[in-house]
Amino acid sequence: YASKEAYPFDKFKVSKFNTPTTKRAIEKEEILKIMAADLSDRDFYTRFSRDIFVFSYLGAGINFTDIALLKHSDIKKERIYYTRKKTGKIINFKLSEQALEIIRRYASPFYGDDDYIFPILNKTEHTTPLQIDNRIHKVIGHVNSKLKKLGKEFGIDNLTTYVARHTYATVLKRSGVNIAIISESLGHSDLSTTQIYLDSFENDQIDEAMQNLL
């Protein structure tokens, strides 16, 4: 075998490559197909999972935990105001007609301001932080399982709730929205986190552009 002297890079430290974030965004056209799909003959959880996915996309990329914690008191004049659990940032976004329709679909006819919007948490059953976290963890597992099955029908690999968040950010970037505004709407603590979301999109653009080099 080769001696150490014969290995010219021995004195250099070879650092591990930073593993990039897995590409999670999908095309806007794919989102629209998911939204338009007729799921009337499917089970409740499949329909619910699609609705949560669409609500996240239309709701400025709101993540599953924050969706689960939303209460009717968070709705003010067709806007949602909530505090992002992960960063503590206060976020608000306008509710589109499609998002309002999803809310109406799951609202109890006798709901109060203190009731959760979506049937994920029950205010009488899930009272401690541990009970709330466990319930959210359990439901997101079911939702993502249904989304992955649904995604396969549309030729989309690994469709999860987080794909909606990443796609929201990517669609805004493609529309020319400033990254600082996207970052603010996502509730990120700094721009570098948002950049990670958008890197795969920019890499795709570079790959496409490089087809024209020769």
Language-model features: locations:
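Basic, Lys/Arg- and aromatic-enriched nucleic-acid-binding interface segment
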Residues: S3-F64
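Conserved tyrosine-mediated DNA breakage-rejoining catalytic core shared by Y-recombinases
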Residues: D10-K11, L69-R105
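Active-site/catalytic core of tyrosine-dependent DNA strand-transfer enzymes
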Residues: I31-L32, S96-I156
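Short, basic (Lys/Arg/His-rich) helix/loop patches that form interaction surfaces
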Residues: A36-F44, R135, N144-E184
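Short alpha-helical segment immediately N-terminal to, or the first helix within
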Residues: F55-S56, L70, V171-L172, S185
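Short, polar N-cap/turn motifs at the start of nucleic acid-interacting alpha helices
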Residues: S73-R79, I156-N158, V177-I196
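Catalytic-site neighborhood detector that most strongly recognizes the C-terminal catalytic loop/helix
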Residues: R84-G88, K123-T124, L186-Q211
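DNA/chromatin major-groove-contacting recognition/catalytic segments
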Residues: K94-E97, E101, R105-A107, D199-L214
